[in-house]
Amino acid sequence: MLSAQSLTKSFGGNRAVDDVSFTLKDETITGLIGPNGAGKTTLFNCVAGLHAPSSGELRLEGERIDGLAPDRIFARGLARTFQIPRPFPDMTVLENVMLAPLDQQGERFWANWLMPARVAAQERAVIAQARHWIDFVGLSHLADQPARILSGGQRKLLELARVLVAKPRLILLDEPGAGVNPALLETIVERIVALNRQGVTFLIIEHNMDLVMSLCRPIMVMAQGKLLTTGTAEEVSRDPRVIDAYLGGAIA
């Protein structure tokens, strides 16, 4: 699905991502953990196209994507969410989700004049898809409400719905559990599992160790820009390098 080969990203003399190589298999939920400053978010930004790697290769389903713009990577089926979602606050939940699909005819001024029936038909299809995914994440009762009224956890669900409407095959989730109450976190986890069973692959940054250990197979561990190890929850929790670098012996 996704592979990195000797991926490096430098800012001045600092290597935020340092010679990282990995392969994500199809239909897996992979965790990415490490202490603050380990390079996890920079790695995400390289994969999603927000940062161009200084060196190395990224391939999505065999095709090079390193250096591509975020919209081109998104169009190839790779989407990401952010630790702090920022929906358009004065637009409704439905309108926020409707923004995501690419190549909407109604975005072209001339199309509204020359092919209004086609524009209207596509808009109806986009609305139906948006409502489907809003219902999937459990926000149908808020579909017509402005996004500004949503809680932090609800905003994460909105962001998930917004990427799902574009039908990605790989989703990068940046701390989906951060600042989320237990009830909404359970909903988020249930949706991730359901999507994975439908064939969606996930790479997840998360500091909630209980969540990572129970949900993710495998788990990758970064520290100081390097990938220390990849393995099962049991293997990672017993690896002395991981304990020294991040877990501090807290996991038995």
Named regions from a protein language model:
Residues 167:
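Conserved catalytic motifs of ABC-family nucleotide-binding domains
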